[in-house]
Amino acid sequence: ISGNAANAVGEKIRKIAKKHQVIAVTHQAILTAKANHNFMVKKVTDNLTTKTVVKNLTEEEIINEIARISGGSITKTAIEHAKELRKTA
């Protein structure tokens, strides 16, 4: 989903989250922007093991992640767009 549909889903999740805990896994910038808390879940492997690492993101890290998932590269323009998404979410 994207655009208006993603925004509508984000609003529904926000409404549900007022009374219930919601955990959503997403690659949608708008959903990330609307979240109260963001976590990065990452798979880390070496030659012997695979681990899952979960990190609670700071506001700056959230902005960078929104920029990354919006366009793939963290550019000045992508950062400004991410800040605007976060501000208006």
List the predicted regions and their residue ranges:
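C-terminal lobe/lid and adjacent interdomain/linker elements of RecA-like ASCE P-loop ATPase modules
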Residues: 4-89
